[in-house]
A protein has these predicted regions:
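Specific alpha-helical transmembrane segments that line the substrate/conduction pathway
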Residues: 53-64, 97, 104-138, 143, ...
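Helix-helix packing/entry segments at the starts of transmembrane helices
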Residues: 31, 57, 116-122, 189-212, ...
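Specific transmembrane alpha-helical segments of multi-pass solute transporters/efflux pumps
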Residues: 33-38, 70-116, 120, 156, ...
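Hydrophobic/small/kink-forming positions within alpha-helical transmembrane segments
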Residues: 35, 39, 60, 94-102, ...
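Hydrophobic transmembrane alpha-helices of multi-pass small-molecule transport proteins
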Residues: 66, 139-161, 282, 294-313
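Membrane-interface helix termini and inter-helical loops of multi-pass transporters
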Residues: 39-51, 78-79, 158-169, 220-236, ...
Length: 324
């Protein structure tokens, strides 16, 4: 008989799954939701929005949407009741989220997108290494295989989408590497950093803190270029940023935290490789970008890696963090 999982807003529909199985779905769902950001951001940029403003608006809208749900659908925990370590982890996670958004969007402007993704999506390896070093997970043969197969599939997709005009830049490589480190930090720190705080409330705090930090960059950068408000009269930009905030920030980050708390950082990071697959499919549907043999073969590799990653060890399946 499976234990019930606490409901605290933005939960998946009730299904006959164990808490571990539900965590697998949450991690995949988070990857799919985050995968919408690439095509959606292109719509906003085409309407005149700058990338720092997009990142700041996304975090702000996500925090506001979650604030409404957190107040109605779940218990709250006073942040003052948290230990200094837990409060420090909150601050670290918010800083990682802000740095991730700024570094990734800046990398896209400095180097070919395919190369940025090839570097950025190395973060599952960083998560696995950190989790093993901290004694949270064991580096089993299945886990190594799932990482290798999934990352090889991703590399096939990325290299298959590189054109003859692809260019490498040291700033672009550095920014993409920083983004990967920030994502790994987010996943590792949030795993056990503040488990008493429900997921929706925790992500609300993280996004709010990240929004403040990103606005500190967006206001001067896009204010000077004129892209801070150039988009406000465009309905397409509003639709894009509202979707990115509600789904690509609020929903995605809550599901991500729920997944990490249930199945761990390494498995979640591999399952979240659904993100680039979603981006490729949406780019084909919304932007008319074709899907070729590399995308099909690479997608198969990512799926095989995800299937291997979601297989739980007996001890892991039985031990799920209570504060989901």
């Amino acid at each position: 008989m499976h234990r019930s999982v606490p409901r605290d807003g933005f939960t998946l529909p009730a299904v006959a799954l164990s808490p571990y199985g539900t965590g697998v779905l949450y991690a995949i769902g988070a990857g799919v939701a985050l995968g919408t950001l690439g095509p959606v951001s292109n719509i906003a940029y085409a309407a005149g929005m700058g990338s720092p403003t997009f990142a700041a608006m996304r975090a702000t809208i996500g925090a506001l949407v979650l604030l409404a749900f957190a107040g109605r659908a779940e218990r709250r925990v006073s942040l003052r009741s948290l230990s200094r370590r837990e409060q420090g982890t909150f601050a670290l996670t918010a800083a990682a989220q802000a740095c991730l958004s700024l570094a990734l969007f800046a990398a896209y402007g400095a180097m070919t997108v395919a190369l940025v993704l090839a570097v950025y999506f190395s973060y599952p390896v960083l998560v696995a290494g950190a989790s093993v070093a901290l004694g949270r997970e064991r580096l089993t043969a299945t886990r190594v295989t799932s990482l290798g197969v999934a990352l090889a599939g991703l590399l096939v997709i990325v290299l298959g989408r590189m054109g003859p005009d692809a260019h490498v830049s040291l700033p672009g490589l550095a920014l993409a590497a920083v983004a990967a480190c920030c994502q790994a930090t987010y996943l590792v720190a949030s795993r056990n950093g503040f488990t008493r705080v429900p997921s929706t409330q925790a992500v609300t705090v993280i996004l709010a803190g990240a929004a403040l930090a990103i606005w500190a960059v967006a206001l001067p950068v896009d204010g000077v270029s004129g892209r801070l408000t150039a988009w406000v009269a465009e309905p397409s930009a509003w639709l894009a940023i509202l979707f990115a905030g509600a789904v690509g920030a609020g929903l995605a980050k809550v599901w991500l935290l729920k997944g990490v708390r249930r199945v761990g950082g390494t498995r979640s990071s591999v399952l979240m490789l659904a993100e680039p697959l979603t981006g490729v499919l949406l780019a084909a549907f919304l932007l008319g970008q074709p899907i070729g043999l590399p995308e099909l073969l690479g997608g198969a590799g990512v799926l095989v890696g995800a299937i291997l990653a979601q297989r739980p060890a007996a001890a892991t399946a039985a031990r799920v963090t209570a504060a989901a």
